């Protein structure tokens, strides 16, 4: 492990090209004028989104922050905004908190509930989600007879949820909605893919694990392949297991990516499959995450900074930061702490009778958050480089916001071809270019960045 030394570094600023979005001329804008304006805005946004491809890809948006910081409020705000802009939007709730129902003024079920023509909402429940994969396994087993009828006797409705199942099954359901690995199979009420999926998960920690799932699974797959190909037990059992997986994925007319392949080809395909998934979380055109904080709560602000660094460690990026308040701000928003992220704020006043989303969305005080949401879903923003290589000086610069130097550990394995960074209960592997591969000569922590010197 290399010790870290303090110094200073200036972060580059972020350049934005803001889009025209919904604005209000007066608080009393008539519904007819509002509808016409929204229609024009919607047309621009949807056309911009689809301009570069004939097959529109579903965007995935989520929010990260401390519990009670306003993640659910931000998710509902974003869902209402995108729906108002004419984008087919699905808000996915994966918790039992009734807050979303209050914010929407509607009950949420385990199948999509239509709030309006552009907005659907669904609550994920793991007890329901585990039934469909079990059904597919049973159908595959009926063809292959691997368990000799034992699997057929399993009653899915009596199975409880074990730790870890929530993240696994939510990822499977989100794959159907978004299509990280293959084309999305779950459609809106018009039979078309959704334009935007807004996800409000169980917790920020669970969401971060989900974000890093594909990249982290690749190393496990590598070791499993070695076990399958180099041991007697692996050579005996892996062909049957791989065939079972192949058959299960072919159920319901979904052609398996492993269809008809040999075991080595299936492992190669799995590696490419996982890389496709990992690249989707890195792609600003597909994935957006926003930090959410209560500006009146210093702990909420500190947590947002930490989750920024944790997202980088998970192998993804943060697109912006939101300050959500139910009343007027009583403290100064710490925008400087989040440079170079774009920062926006919104006030969502609660009443006993519910929320008037037309009034909230068209409030000029909330224009900055609408601008940021529209910008990121339509064109994306310039993102801070989290890893930079200087081959001339043999330097590796790792942007690690939210961490102190004592919280970062640096390791090196595999003959100097990569670095292993541990921070925020996440491990990240940095593959080094051939020009700077070698042993670590030193490291220092400089204004939210770890600068490693190679020799």
From Swiss-Prot:
> Any idea which positions bind ATP?
65-72, 182, 328
Report the InterPro entries cross-referenced here: Anion-transp_ATPase-like_dom, ArsA_ATPase-like, ArsA_HSP20-like, HSP20-like_chaperone, P-loop_NTPase
Q: Which UniProt keywords apply?
A: ATP-binding, Chloroplast, Hydrolase, Nucleotide-binding, Plastid, Transit peptide
> What molecular function terms (GO) are annotated for this protein?
ATP binding; hydrolase activity; identical protein binding; protein homodimerization activity; protein-transporting ATPase activity
Q: Which CDD domains match?
A: ArsA
| Top-level taxon in the UniProt lineage | Eukaryota
A GO BP annotation: protein transmembrane transport
- Primary role: ATPase binding tail-anchored (TA) integral membrane protein and required for the homeostasis of photosynthetic machinery.
**What's the protein name?**
ATPase GET3D, chloroplastic
Origin organism is Arabidopsis thaliana (Mouse-ear cress)
Question: Which lineage is the organism of this entry classified under, starting from the top rank?
Answer: Eukaryota, Viridiplantae, Streptophyta, Embryophyta, Tracheophyta
